[in-house]
């Protein structure tokens, strides 16, 4: 086998990167057919790579054996106030013929990210079904932080205790809103987010969402009190479930919370059934969602509801 050569990523490698990414996505779709088919075409895959390469601060590396390009890795920057001084390897930001070569690519690219760009927080979105690739990332110091999930939408009946929210529910929804962020901020997640919006700004945002007929905002009531809520919207509105992770015509389950005192009572299951019923009524066939892997409740609840992991967000922080 020819020796591996690592070079900086440049435009001359875009077509090769598209071919590698298309092959990766084809293998991914063999494990999860609900993912979008079009990125099995090298030209479509190359467009995703090019979009990353044109992003501010993009940099990376390619791997060659002889004259053949056998891997690439691209990193971009996102908002520091959310992610810290960061570099992201996005959905279309990497593909290799041999998983071990990913480690060499990362070693080359990360030298710039850390030593020159001073960006020590690294994130990578990796196909969950490719165990060898996930393992290669783990052997350069990455661990699981977040999971994307997908499933077919099952036929379901509306539970009596769940209904669509109306503007009259806004105060109850405001009271419920901190439940998720409070839970995520605790052990073992320790999530950090943006400062909370003021109540008036959040009220206006909720009312705007409730007026949007493309959305499904569900509430679960017990004894006249809203104890849980799910929010659904077209997946096209999501910046997370995009590109290779967004099936055509999918619905996003984008927010979900139940009060701590009703967990285990069936409220979450009832809301899930109502979410399926609403989505089927709207003509959707596929649902996507995501969760923090370290969130013990979510990481058990969503797979138990039939969601299969599609991508894992891996994370490494270099002190």
Question: What is each model feature region?
Answer:
Residues 209-219, 223-255, 259-269:
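Intrinsically disordered, low-complexity segments enriched in Gly and acidic/Ser/Thr residues
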Residues 68, 77-80, 90-159, 311-319:
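Acyl-donor-binding surface of acyltransferase catalytic domains
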Residues 1-42, 159-198:
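Short amphipathic alpha-helix that is part of the acyltransferase structural core
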Residues 59, 119-120, 285:
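Short acidic/polar active-site loop segments enriched in Thr and Asp
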């Amino acid at each position: 086998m020819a020796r591996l050569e690592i070079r900086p990523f440049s435009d001359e490698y875009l077509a090769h990167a598209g071919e590698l990414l298309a092959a990766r996505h084809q293998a991914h779709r063999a494990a999860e057919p609900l993912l979008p088919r079009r990125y099995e075409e090298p030209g479509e895959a190359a467009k995703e790579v090019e979009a990353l390469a044109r992003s501010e601060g993009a940099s990376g590396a390619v791997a060659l054996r002889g004259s053949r390009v056998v891997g690439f890795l691209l990193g971009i920057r996102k908002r520091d106030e959310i992610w810290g001084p960061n570099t992201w390897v996005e959905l279309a930001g990497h593909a290799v013929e041999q998983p071990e070569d990913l480690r060499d690519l990362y070693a080359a690219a990360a030298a710039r990210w850390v030593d020159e760009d001073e960006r020590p927080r690294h994130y990578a979105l990796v196909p969950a079904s490719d165990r060898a690739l996930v393992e290669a990332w783990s052997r350069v110091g990455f661990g699981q932080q977040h999971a994307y999930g997908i499933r077919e939408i099952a036929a379901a009946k509306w539970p009596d205790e769940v209904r669509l929210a109306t503007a009259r529910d806004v105060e109850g929804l405001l009271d419920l809103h901190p439940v998720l962020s409070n839970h995520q901020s605790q052990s073992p997640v320790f999530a950090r987010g943006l400062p909370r919006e003021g109540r008036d700004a959040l009220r206006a945002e909720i009312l705007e969402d409730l007026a949007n007929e493309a959305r499904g905002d569900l509430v679960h009531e017990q004894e006249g009190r809203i104890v849980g809520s799910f929010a659904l919207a077209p997946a096209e509105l999501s910046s997370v479930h995009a590109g290779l992770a967004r099936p055509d015509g999918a619905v996003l389950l984008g927010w979900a919370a139940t009060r701590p005192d009703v967990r285990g009572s069936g409220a979450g299951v009832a809301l899930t059934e109502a979410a399926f019923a609403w989505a089927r009524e709207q003509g959707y066939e596929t649902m996507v969602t995501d969760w923090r892997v370290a969130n013990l409740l979510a990481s058990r609840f969503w797979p138990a509801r039939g969601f299969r992991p599609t991508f894992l967000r891996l994370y490494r922080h270099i002190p």
